[in-house]
């Protein structure tokens, strides 16, 4: 997982055969730094740190060589762009295959991606599925689809998924992998095997990192660039950009001890951002290695909760949290309106993050009222239609303010969703369990010009469709 690379160079030898102009550079490459070389300046002028007596000092130096926040953000951006390009290339292949146009709808494509990714990921105690394991048998009982489904079950079991969750996920994936067109060999090779070969080569290496990204949100967005996700208009499937989910998690004062929930989680983008902030806070505040490891496990297993009613989107949320390694313990496929009181009794939420379906009652404020009614402390950050706060959210907004304080209202750009939805939104920030007094000061901020220039070109990358043209990162940080 780590290596020290030392290069020595020189051009001139003296009469004793010694290099008179030596140059030395050393770089530390490690998994913790996503294999980005970090310069070890202390070894440039002397290699004395390599002596056995000094090795502890060298280890201390290497332990402190970490990526800067700027380097991490650059890696994240590059990874997202590369992932998006690879996904679109695979989807273009599916889109251009005339034989598949009537075989795979958009939901099926989501299931193909998520299923093959689950099958191809490594996990402790289970050998990852290799392309060579798929034999393209022309058999109803033993074919590539059956092999993939079996491997998914083993993978989920190894990740300690409950029996109910395994059954739900394999049921959702079953139809597409049991489809004869998918597993029947053509020229000696099944479509499943061809797609898995490309996903294994192009997609999975990008997912097996310690970056906290909304990976499956990127998959969903890439597919919805081409065709609408089934039911997305009825259920308002619009994913919140990652820079906004991170911004909102910070507005809600998320930290290592927060308990974060989202009752309309989509692909889990808010929970991914919250987890990232929580883990970084733990790393900054906990010195003991064993205590830190235990805290990170607790964050992933006990301090995050999400609910999603749509099966095709829920499975993306579960995969996202598995890729985070593994925060899927408290992910529920259900109607949160039926579940929130039951969950509220078991989960001591202190942070509520939400981008609700705006077609719901009160423009989505019904979700807010239900969630905040179960909380006794903390903060909530809600991305919602701006007019919901000026009458269209009644009676829910009035009820919310009886028990909670509106701290801030932040007007967001009307093209926030880059062409996928054109609606004027605002972020409302609440302090929970403190009734709003009419004399309370509310902070109003206009972020409608946030520094990003957006467009929605189907075949363009995020670099093209979202450009920082006027200090956008600094504005959100401020």
What is the predicted role of each segment?
Residues 114-118, 122-228:
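Long recognition/docking surfaces used for binding and targeting
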Residues 238-354, 365, 385-386:
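Conserved S-adenosyl-L-methionine
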Residues 36-38, 333, 345-478:
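A conserved structural/catalytic subdomain of Rossmann-like adenosyl-cofactor enzymes
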Residues 1-36:
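Nucleic-acid nuclease catalytic cores
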Residues 58-94:
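Non-catalytic protein-protein interaction scaffold segments in large eukaryotic complex-forming proteins
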Residues 217-243, 249-250:
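Class I SAM-dependent transferase core
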Residues 82-104, 199-204:
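Short amphipathic alpha-helical segments and their helix-coil junctions
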Residues 96-113, 207-214:
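Structural motif
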């Amino acid at each position: 997982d780590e290596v020290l690379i030392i290069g020595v160079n020189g051009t001139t030898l003296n009469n004793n055969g010694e290099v008179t102009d030596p140059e030395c550079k050393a770089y530390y490459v490690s998994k913790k730094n996503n294999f980005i070389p970090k310069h070890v300046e202390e070894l440039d002028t002397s290699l004395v740190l390599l002596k056995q007596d000094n090795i502890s000092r060298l280890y201390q130096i290497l332990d402190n060589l970490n990526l800067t926040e700027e380097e991490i953000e650059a890696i994240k951006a590059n990874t997202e762009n590369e992932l998006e390009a690879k996904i679109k290339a695979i989807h273009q292949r599916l889109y251009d295959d005339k034989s598949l146009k009537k075989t795979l709808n958009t939901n099926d494509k989501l299931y193909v991606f998520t299923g093959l990714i689950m099958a191809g990921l490594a996990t402790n105690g289970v050998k990852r599925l290799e392309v060579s394991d798929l034999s393209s048998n022309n058999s109803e009982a033993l074919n590539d689809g059956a092999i993939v489904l079996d491997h998914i079950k083993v993978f989920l079991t190894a990740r300690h998924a409950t029996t109910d969750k395994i059954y739900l996920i394999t049921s959702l994936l079953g139809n597409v992998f049991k489809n004869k067109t998918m597993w029947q060999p053509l020229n000696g090779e099944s479509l499943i095997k061809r797609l898995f070969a490309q996903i294994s080569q192009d997609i999975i290496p990008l997912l097996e990192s310690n970056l906290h990204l909304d990976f499956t949100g990127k998959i969903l967005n890439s597919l919805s660039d081409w065709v609408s996700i089934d039911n997305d208009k009825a259920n308002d499937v619009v994913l919140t950009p990652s820079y906004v989910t991170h911004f909102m998690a910070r507005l809600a004062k998320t930290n290592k001890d927060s308990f974060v929930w989202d009752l309309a989680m989509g692909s889990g983008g808010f929970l991914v951002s919250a987890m990232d902030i929580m883990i970084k806070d733990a790393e900054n505040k906990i010195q003991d290695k064993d205590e830190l490891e235990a805290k990170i496990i607790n964050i992933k297993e006990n301090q995050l909760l999400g609910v999603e009613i749509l099966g095709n989107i829920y499975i993306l949320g579960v995969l996202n949290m598995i890729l985070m390694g593994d925060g899927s313990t408290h992910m529920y496929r259900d109607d949160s309106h039926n579940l929130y009181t039951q969950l509220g009794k078991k989960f001591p939420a202190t942070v509520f993050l939400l981008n609700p379906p705006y077609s719901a009652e009160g423009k989505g404020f019904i979700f807010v009222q239900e969630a905040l009614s179960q909380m006794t402390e903390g903060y909530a950050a809600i991305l919602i239609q701006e007019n919901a706060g000026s009458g269209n959210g009644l009676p829910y907004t009035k009820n919310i303010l009886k028990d909670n304080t509106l701290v801030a209202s932040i007007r967001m750009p009307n093209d926030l969703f880059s062409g996928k939805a054109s609606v004027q939104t605002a972020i409302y920030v609440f302090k929970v369990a403190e009734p709003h007094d009419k004399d309370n000061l509310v902070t109003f901020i206009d972020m409608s010009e946030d520094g990003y220039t957006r467009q929605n070109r189907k075949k363009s990358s995020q670099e093209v469709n979202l450009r920082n043209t006027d200090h956008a990162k600094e504005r959100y940080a401020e």
